[in-house]
Amino acid sequence: MGGQACAVATGPGAGAAARDQAAVAGIRTVLTTQTAAWNRGDIPGFMQGYWKSDSLVFIGRRGPTYGWQQTLDNYRKGYPDAATMGQLDFSGLRISLLAPNAAQVVGRWHLARPSAGDVQGHFLLVMRQVGGQWVVAADHTNSE
């Protein structure tokens, strides 16, 4: 992910603009932290960016999965070793705030896997701020 431009707003909307900038920065931090964990082969660390709730929903090629633990278990089954996990990269991120504590993120993912073959696709995340932290509450990911 490239550098970010930062504008400081003044006037009546300055508080909202600053809050929005902080939200976007917080969301980017979650995604950067997840990428780093994945690239270390740390699926539990990657999962820290997800809402630790039975209400979490992940939609992939096999349909919806509900709950944090089931999502973790599915990741562990689908990516049993570092070679299968590869190196994750997100690009083309578009973050849209829906409310002060909710956002959607659209982007592209790519796994560089020299021995297992590269895979890539797109995703749509719904993120919520829970307990002051941004987390993924819903993840719809596809592969090409």
Question: Can you say where each PLM-predicted feature lies in the sequence?
Answer:
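A short hydrophobic beta-strand element
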Residues: 101-109
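Solvent-exposed loop/turn segments at secondary-structure junctions
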Residues: 56, 63-65, 111-112, 142-144
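Short beta-strand edge/turn micro-motifs at domain boundaries
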Residues: 118-144
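Hydrophobic/aromatic beta-strand elements that line small-molecule binding cavities or substrate pockets
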Residues: 75, 91-96, 108-111, 122-128
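A solvent-exposed, acidic/Ser-Thr-rich amphipathic alpha-helical stretch
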Residues: 43-98, 118
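Short, low-complexity N-terminal intrinsically disordered segments enriched in polar/charged residues
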Residues: 5-49, 70
